[in-house]
Amino acid sequence: MSNVSMKAMLEAGVHFGHQTSRWNPKMGQYIFGERNGVHILDLQKTAKELKKATAFIKEEAKKGARFLFVGTKKQAQEAIKSEAERCGAYVISEKWLGGTLTNFQTVKKSVERLNELEKWEREGVFKAISKKEASRLGKEMVRLQTLLGGIREMKSLPDVVFVIDPVDTQGAVKEAVILNIPVVAVCDTNADPDNIDYPIPGNDDAARSIKLFCAAVADSIIEGRTEAEGPKQPAQETPAAEVENTIMAQALEGALTEEVAVPAEKTVEETVKPEGAVVIEEGEEIEEEEKLHGREEKKAKKEAVKKKPVVKKAPKAKKVESAD
């Protein structure tokens, strides 16, 4: 829930009301006094009512409620549009069309008409017709964009209506009351708080005061939706010691498996060999036998050569030359 300090409200001029001649006696419970012909609001009561209103808004936001911001006076337009956009609320900041809530089906048809005109413009239809007709359709499109731009995505009635100055936008308040839609409103000293579910006594003419209230409501909506989504759980990291123990256990298990396990293809007799024994495969055994026969044959030949008697040749006779 958004908390607004007394200092912030004083700096924004929240405590300034209307002239004493323009007050509504029903707002008397929220008035602190009078100064220079102007009523001064009790900021302690303002803080209390603002806290109640934002608590309600936050709870509704948790439930997935849809909000409509309404503020059509010039000094409220910028603040109410920007804050509604920030918190994802619908907004009407130009003019309240009678029947926006009570005749919502007609409003939906107007939105469909707006979508159709924008489609024609994209497809170049305006260029294919007369300039007079194109101008007429263009003006109609701009008018609908201005009036319905902030609610064109609103497929059903809102769950809560937030109003700046219920006197200026009394049409919105009346329609919300008829449809039993809760109303939260910033009420100056000239307002009637009876039809407001959550009245917030405050200055509804100063731009800074309006900005403060709009921001507080938007913050409450964002907080409620964030809490409804729940905090994001960070990925849990496995402790280093646990990882090390797991690796050691796997390594030990693998070593034991290699030492004890008997391959399915071999018999126990083939697997269990004396220490230091050399295991020879079938092909290697034949090759080794051939090599052994070859060595034995060579050895026999050598022995035969040794046993064979050696015959010495007689020396050649020397040739004697005859003497003539």
From Swiss-Prot:
<dbReference type="GO" id="GO:0022627">
    <property type="term" value="C:cytosolic small ribosomal subunit"/>
</dbReference>
<dbReference type="GO" id="GO:0003735">
    <property type="term" value="F:structural constituent of ribosome"/>
</dbReference>
<keyword id="KW-0689">Ribosomal protein</keyword>
<comment type="similarity">
    <text>Belongs to the universal ribosomal protein uS2 family.</text>
</comment>
<dbReference type="InterPro" id="IPR018130">
    <property type="entry name" value="Ribosomal_uS2_CS"/>
</dbReference>
<feature type="region of interest" description="Disordered">
    <location>
        <begin position="273"/>
        <end position="324"/>
    </location>
</feature>
<dbReference type="InterPro" id="IPR023591">
    <property type="entry name" value="Ribosomal_uS2_flav_dom_sf"/>
</dbReference>
<dbReference type="GO" id="GO:0006412">
    <property type="term" value="P:translation"/>
</dbReference>
<dbReference type="InterPro" id="IPR001865">
    <property type="entry name" value="Ribosomal_uS2"/>
</dbReference>
<dbReference type="Pfam" id="PF00318">
    <property type="entry name" value="Ribosomal_S2"/>
</dbReference>
<dbReference type="InterPro" id="IPR005706">
    <property type="entry name" value="Ribosomal_uS2_bac/mit/plastid"/>
</dbReference>
<feature type="compositionally biased region" description="Basic residues">
    <location>
        <begin position="304"/>
        <end position="317"/>
    </location>
</feature>
<feature type="compositionally biased region" description="Basic and acidic residues">
    <location>
        <begin position="290"/>
        <end position="303"/>
    </location>
</feature>
<protein>
    <recommendedName>
        <fullName>Small ribosomal subunit protein uS2</fullName>
    </recommendedName>
</protein>
<keyword id="KW-0687">Ribonucleoprotein</keyword>
